[in-house]
């Protein structure tokens, strides 16, 4: 006789249910030259699929300049002005979205996270298949 497995929701599920996040895809493909991202009340999610990137910030607490040399996810949970500097000939491939957190700047999830998370894609096991589906969209 089988018994149903009771699952207890974790604390994060409750927060995400109450403070929803909406993503709006706005770019997929090459970015060449200088691209500045500055949208008030929005976060950003960028996936560098191939190529490399020089990234700059003017905000306190973030590196002025960063070099990203492998496929990576760049997650800005809150508004932070950031600029991509890409070679004009060899455009790096990106998928980019804005993120809108319910509650705006007061969203507890967005406030609890650091201003920037950079995650090389190779560090996340099994992510290749999910990203392949995303990039095919």
Regions found by a protein language model. Give the residues of each.
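A short, N-terminal "cap"/entry segment at the start of jelly-roll beta-barrel domains
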Residues: 1-25, 29, 33-37
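An acidic intrinsically disordered interaction segment
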Residues: 11-17, 119-126
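N-terminal regulatory/effector-sensing and dimerization cores
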Residues: 24-116, 123-126
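Basic, alpha-helical interaction scaffolds
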Residues: 129-131
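Basic, amphipathic alpha-helical hairpins
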Residues: 133-137
